[in-house]
UniProtKB/Swiss-Prot annotation:
UniProt keywords, alphabetically: Coiled coil, Leucine-rich repeat, Repeat
Entry superkingdom: Eukaryota
Domain LRRCT, chain residue ranges per copy: 132-179
PROSITE patterns membership: IQ, LRR
Residue intervals of the IQ domain: 215-244
Protein name: Leucine-rich repeat and IQ domain-containing protein 3
């Protein structure tokens, strides 16, 4: 509708005012939310998601789950790997009536009392609490299993009957936490999962838990056996009763009618009752899954009533004078021309028996018309071909004829009764003619009634056609008016859109010119500023250079002064060292002279002593 960049003027338009409200309204339709490992701390945004069914908030920093109170349609809730330390009260869990799977493992729960509030959850099937501090407490599993009644699985194991029923010691197969009861219903999360996949996963987990319980729960196994026994016990009289009733019906109709079975149920019953050696369970299972009704039963019964109303008038009033010759056999594949009004089909076991109508010569002439009517009211549908057992052709009982001939024989008591026989034949023929006339009259009445019905049907069809055409014309006119209104609204909308677009483009061009002027001024100001900055930079550089040169000169002067000072200090130091050296040399010489004097004196003393010693010790004879 708008072209160009979205600006503040567009976002403040009245058509954009409900944008945020629409977003909030759209959150009500969310059914699947998955925020895994996003370091979230709050769930406040889920308060408006009232249609949420699957919620995955694992591996975050969630501490409060009260915002989920409005999500009453939750089926699966995954909160593992968070920092939850306490659960809401029973009112919160009582509102989650559809919650089946709850994942709370790897959290900070520490008290069993706080966990017991989950007993208010009415449909909770599977729960995980492992890797929590509370799972290390003694009796943790016993308390949870006996507090949450609908619970079927807890922490990778399905709940056994030994954990529920007190003081019941079972074999190893049915004990708690057996390997047969192991089921990991919290697999690792996969990326890109959809809502349908999550729902299918929930169904798979539920069915798997039920299957494990069905095969490893003694209570359920015994219940299944008892139900099977009761069902077989209740159904056995039905089978025996139906078999006896079938035999009675067969014996009763062996001398009267040949019945035709229609429908898949009758074929099944015929196989069950006539062939006892067949597989009854297989037949029942096949009938259960493959039963087929090609036409609506109620509609078929209503259609048959129209035909039966015409055929009922073809029957003679005196039922006692029905001719046995009108009863004929129906071969395989042949269908009766008209049928008696059908009763509503019952889904229970029964044998369908249809009586054959009686026809006269007049009624058989209109066979094609009746067949067309039958095809109109009973459309042809593909039906399975049923096997009919051939029946022996019933022969006419001629005992009465034989007795009449014997009575009218001339040998009877020597009396000729030929005249009476002729009179009796005359009256018989007269009755037959009257009976035939009555039948012709009934057929004529039926034809008149059929013609009347045909005219009424045609009138009804014409009225329906006229009403339909009138309704179609009215609908066309309404559609045309609606289309004109739609086109007019669209034209008005386009005009308003064009006006708004022109106004928007005008404002846009004006703002573009203003923006260009501002840009030119900014460019000139920028150039001036750059020149001033360049001059300031040059002046600063010159000042810096002068300062640096001055510093260098001062450093050179200081260096020269330092060198001269070092030279003078070296000279003074050398003089002092020389003077000290001379003094030390004089002192050393004096010390050496004193030592030499002392040595000389010692030597003189020793010499004197030696001399004195020699004077006393030398014998006189040795002295010259």
């Amino acid at each position: 509708m708008f072209h160009g960049t979205v600006t503040e003027e567009l976002t403040s338009h009245e058509e954009w005012s409900h944008y945020n409200e629409n977003i909030r309204e759209g959150q009500k339709d969310f059914v699947f939310v998955k925020f895994n490992g996003l370091h979230l701390k709050s769930m406040e945004n889920l308060q408006s998601c009232i249609s949420l069914r699957v919620c995955i908030f694992s591996n975050n920093f969630i501490t409060d789950i009260h915002p989920l109170q409005s999500c009453i349609k939750l089926i699966k809730l995954d909160l593992h790997g968070n920092q939850i330390k306490s659960l809401p009260n029973t009112k919160f869990w009582n509102g989650l009536k559809n919650l089946k799977l709850l994942y709370l493992h790897d959290n900070g729960f520490a008290k069993l009392k706080n966990i017991c509030v989950l007993s208010a959850c009415p449909t909770l099937i599977a729960l995980t609490m492992f890797d929590c501090p509370v799972s290390l407490k003694k009796g943790y599993r016993h308390v949870l299993v006996n507090s949450i009644w609908p619970l079927k699985a807890l922490d990778h194991h399905v709940i056994s009957d030994e954990e529920i029923i007190q003081n019941w010691h079972l074999p190893e197969r049915f004990k708690a936490c057996n390997h047969r009861l192991f089921f990991n219903f919290c697999p690792a999360l996969r990326k890109g999962t959809t809502y349908e996949e999550e729902i299918n996963n929930i169904k798979h987990i539920t069915s798997k838990i039920n299957a494990i319980l069905a095969h490893n729960s003694p209570v359920l196994i015994v219940q299944r056996w008892i139900r099977g026994f009761l069902v077989r016990k209740n159904l056995s009289p039905v089978f025996f009763h139906k078999k006896k009733q079938q035999e009675k019906i067969i014996r009763g109709y062996e001398a009267k009618w040949i019945y035709i079975t229609k429908g898949y149920e009758d074929k099944l019953l015929k196989d069950l009752f006539f062939k006892p050696e067949t597989n009854i369970k297989g037949k029942l299972a096949y009938w259960k899954h493959n039963i087929y009704y090609p036409v609506d039963l109620k509609n078929s019964s209503e259609h048959r009533k129209h035909v039966s109303s015409i055929l009922c008038e073809l029957k003679p009033k005196d039922l006692g004078m029905k001719s046995k010759t009108s009863r004929h056999l129906i071969q395989k594949g042949q269908e009766s021309e008209d049928e008696i009004v059908d009763e509503k089909l019952d889904t229970s076991f029964r044998i369908s028996v249809f009586k054959l109508p009686i026809y006269t010569s007049g009624s058989l002439k209109n066979n094609a018309v009746l067949r067309e009517k039958k095809q109109h009211f009973f459309p042809a549908y593909p039906q399975p071909i049923y096997t009919t057992h051939p029946k022996p052709i019933i022969k006419k009982d001629i005992r009465l004829e034989r007795s009449m001939k014997e009575f009218f024989a001339p040998q009877r008591a020597g009396m000729k009764l030929r005249t009476f026989s002729d009179i009796d034949k005359y009256y018989t023929e007269q009755k037959k003619q009257e009976y035939h006339k009555e039948k012709v009259r009934v057929v004529a009445m039926a034809q008149v009634a059929r013609e009347r019905v045909r005219v009424a049907v045609n009138e009804h069809l014409n009225q329906k056609k006229y009403a339909t055409q009138k309704l179609i014309e009215e609908n066309k006119e309404t559609i045309q008016n609606s289309l004109r209104q739609v086109w007019q609204n669209r034209f008005n909308y386009l005009e308003k859109a064009r006006e708004r677009k022109a106004l928007f483009l005008k404002e846009k061009s004006q703002k573009a010119s203003e923006r260009l002027l501002v840009q030119n001024l900014n460019n000139e100001r920028t150039l001036l500023t750059r020149g001033l900055l360049k001059i300031d930079r040059l002046e600063k550089n010159e000042a810096v250079l002068k300062e640096k040169s001055l510093i260098v000169k001062q450093k050179l002067k200081a260096e020269k002064y330092r060198k001269n000072l070092l030279k003078e200090m070296k000279k003074v130091r050398s003089q002092e060292i020389y003077k000290r050296h001379c003094e030390e040399k004089f002192v050393m010489d004096m010390i050496a002279f004193e030592k030499a004097c002392e040595r000389l004196q010692d030597a003189k003393t020793k010499v004197a002593i030696v001399k004195t010693n020699l004077d006393f010790k030398v014998p006189n004879g040795l002295i010259k």
